[in-house]
């Protein structure tokens, strides 16, 4: 339901072309306050997502459905079209969305296959980056686009950048030329 406002991603779910299962790490919180974060061990600013609730959440995902585990992280490899195409070929993908200052390094070291960044800027949480990743990957799944060849000529496919100006054929005449 959360993806309803996401247009194409929601439509792809409704058509059963993709399946998105959300896991709430607060269900694996360590206390009655649903705490999933803690101050960094050794000091420092901000809060870090704790290892225990994250590990429990990962382990609660059916092993056969877990697949490749990606952590959306500003320290990760910058996402590009080649990576999108590679990830689109995977049967299952688990995306960990960080918050605060990040997640406990033990989770990264023992469970994460890959860290991915969508750019050199800060977001409130990894959910926004995950949505970008899901949308870009799902465009490459058969049946998601009206024209199956559309993604072959996308801006970044095969090193292409749009090399022409784009116009529509409507008769808008507002003195625009």
Residue spans for each PLM region:
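S-adenosyl-L-methionine/SAH cofactor-binding core of RNA-modifying enzymes
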Residues: 48-97
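Long, charged alpha-helical interface segments
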Residues: 156-169
